Curated annotation (Swiss-Prot):
Binds as a heterodimer with protein bS6 to the central domain of the 16S rRNA, where it helps stabilize the platform of the 30S subunit. SUPFAM superfamilies: Ribosomal protein S18 (SSF46911). GO terms for cellular component: cytosolic small ribosomal subunit. The gene is rpsR1. Part of the 30S ribosomal subunit. Forms a tight heterodimer with protein bS6. One of its GO terms (molecular function) is small ribosomal subunit rRNA binding. This is Small ribosomal subunit protein bS18A. It comes from Mycobacterium tuberculosis (strain ATCC 25618 / H37Rv). Belongs to the bacterial ribosomal protein bS18 family. InterPro entries: Ribosomal_bS18, Ribosomal_bS18_CS, Ribosomal_bS18_sf.
Length: 84
């Protein structure tokens, strides 16, 4: 026989939907030379943050990933973090 569970179901939390910053502000462009902007989309370990974390749309997340990779190639951004 199965044991009856007395646990209550978890309360449902409202889902926060983030809007893409670049779709909201049409004049803001993604450029590999803008390291201040790109650093906000890189974790402290040097990884590119996921789309579900940043809240960007698919196209702008791809553009950010491409810009980060280009900035790494021209040594504007590090490939890894300097923290050990």
């Amino acid at each position: 026989m199965a044991k009856s569970s007395k646990r209550r179901p978890a309360p449902e939390k409202p889902v926060k939907t983030r809007k893409c910053v670049f779709c909201a502000k049409k004049d803001q462009a993604i450029d590999y030379k803008d390291t201040a902007l790109l650093r906000t989309y890189i974790s402290e370990r040097g990884k590119i943050r996921a789309r579900r974390v940043t809240g960007n749309c698919v196209q702008h997340q791809r553009d950010i990933a491409l810009a980060v990779k280009n900035a790494r190639e021209v040594a504007l951004l590090p490939f890894t973090s300097s923290v050990r």
